[in-house]
């Protein structure tokens, strides 16, 4: 195989994407499981659920942090590795990514900070609300990123003008059937992955303690 600059760029981008995407579904899935655990604690007042929540929260936060860092690297590589593509579709591709960064990511970051630093400082009901808002933020984040990805798979709402793609219908971007297919697939897969990962690690720990 001839390792020219394009092939090397593809290999680098593929490695970054694969590494990044391991943490994305894992953090989405574990986030929902942690939220369910804390909800059970609030409802049943059983300290076992609180211990479970705090234990898995550490793993969720680590996965979330690594996912954010690798995601930033991936976004930089769009400009560094595929600058021609970025110039061609930047007006369209950048819009959902900007919404994701300015709205969804800030929502996640704000409430994950409130959730992390307000144990025993706010009421349990308010505290569990924070983690559910984090989960809502991850859904929004995934949605807008998948809007950008769905345009790559099935371009809609654009026209070619002077050799560049220009947006003609912003609503068409996030109402495309492709977005629905990708979003349901990714979120369902993430929740399943999170549940299986937690169940698997818990099963290993139970076997070790026998």
Spell out what each predicted region is.
Residues 1-210:
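Polytopic transmembrane helical bundles with strong interfacial aromatic enrichment
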